[in-house]
């Protein structure tokens, strides 16, 4: 099979793609990985010892030709595309190559142009299965004219063992001069408009009025970095000095372990892998009630949901948690239980493997009698060691 990624840059889709590649059962499948561009995600996969081919071709028709040749040359039976361009290029190439099974995961809640929506709708009849991470994304995709597709809702999952490892000393607080006992808010996300960091920055003056010792770390990189830093710098002291931009980090599990409250102030979100990671680390979450987030968080149990683009509501929720260590602990334990029950990486991969086998049998590429033995759940499979996956 081929796992096809649209872009080798950073984001939640690449995080899900990486987890899937690391956990797929190599005794059942010959797995290949290919990205339609190079970037930090490709570099990370290679550092983890995975072979990743790259077709770095900006022209779509040329990319289709190269991918078609790759599919034929490597006798690919199943193509699983991740992200928009991979779905478009992958579907066209798979049809040309006669690939038995064509699937895609719709990772993004992005609002598509009319042209993009039309292109995806036109390709939907050749897709054997579409996977979505949440019911909200399912509704969105159906509304875009793809309702005739065969869908499976499979939530993103996180590697629980990775977040069970003892805290390593990433020295985040010492690195940035953050006092050890100060409540620390943290947002781990691409610095893009849809992630809503600006609303959390705007909330910081009110947060410090209600919880004067609070600090905020903003982890990630992206197109809004300069604008967000300028916004933070325009705030009065001591507020401005309490907002720290860390850039891209290679120790996301350790960073998550050092924060006290995880915040995701997105204005749209497919699901929110970073909040799953925080919950796996037993951290309470404040997040916008958008997209798939309410399907993850139960307000008042394992986190606090707030309206999107609302600095006042963000401030109130953050103050409530910053001022109550006991509440943070209770919500953190509840969040861990939620992830264990519904959002583990092994469960995600198991469900996807079941779909692979079902579709391969349907296409005649796998004998029906072989499918049951190819799907098995192992707590710590051989060859799937717990790895510290660097952040995107």
Predicted features and spans:
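A conserved, positively charged/aromatic
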Residues: 101-133, 144-146
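Carbohydrate-associated surface elements
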Residues: 136, 157
């Amino acid at each position: 099979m081929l796992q096809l990624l649209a872009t080798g840059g950073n984001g939640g889709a690449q995080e899900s793609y990486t987890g899937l590649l690391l956990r797929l059962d190599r005794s059942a499948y010959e797995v290949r990985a290919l990205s339609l561009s190079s970037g930090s995600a490709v570099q990370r996969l290679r550092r983890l010892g995975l072979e990743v081919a790259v077709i770095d071709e900006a022209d779509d028709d040329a990319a289709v030709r190269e991918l078609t040749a790759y599919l034929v040359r490597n006798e690919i039976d199943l193509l699983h595309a991740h992200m928009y361009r991979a779905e478009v290029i992958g579907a066209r190439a798979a049809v040309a190559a006669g690939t038995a099974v064509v699937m895609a995961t719709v990772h993004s809640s992005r609002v598509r142009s009319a042209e993009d929506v039309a292109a995806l709708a036109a390709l939907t009849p050749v897709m054997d299965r579409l996977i979505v991470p949440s019911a909200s994304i399912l509704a969105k995709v159906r509304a875009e004219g793809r309702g005739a597709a065969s869908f499976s809702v499979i939530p993103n999952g996180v590697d629980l063992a990775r977040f069970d490892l003892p805290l390593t000393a990433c020295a985040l607080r010492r690195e940035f001069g953050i006092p050890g006992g100060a409540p620390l808010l943290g947002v781990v996300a691409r610095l893009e408009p849809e992630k809503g960091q600006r609303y959390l920055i705007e909330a910081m003056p009110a947060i410090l009025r209600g919880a004067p010792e609070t600090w905020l770390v903003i982890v990630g990189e992206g197109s809004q970095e300069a604008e967000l830093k300028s916004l933070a710098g325009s705030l009065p002291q001591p507020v401005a000095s309490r907002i720290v931009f860390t850039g891209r980090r290679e120790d996301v599990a350790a960073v998550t372990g050092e924060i006290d409250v995880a915040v995701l102030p997105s204005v749209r979100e497919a699901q929110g892998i970073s909040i799953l990671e925080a919950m796996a680390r037993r951290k309470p979450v404040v997040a916008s009630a958008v997209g798939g987030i309410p399907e993850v968080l139960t307000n008042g149990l394992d986190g606090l949901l707030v309206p999107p683009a609302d600095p006042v509501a963000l401030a109130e929720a953050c103050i409530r948690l910053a001022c109550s260590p006991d509440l943070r602990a209770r919500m953190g334990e509840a969040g861990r239980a939620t992830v264990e029950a519904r959002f583990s990486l092994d469960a995600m991969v198991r469900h996807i493997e079941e779909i692979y086998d079902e579709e391969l049998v349907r296409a005649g590429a796998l004998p029906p009698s072989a499918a049951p033995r190819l799907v098995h759940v192992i707590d710590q499979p051989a060859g799937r060691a717990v790895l510290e996956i660097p952040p995107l």
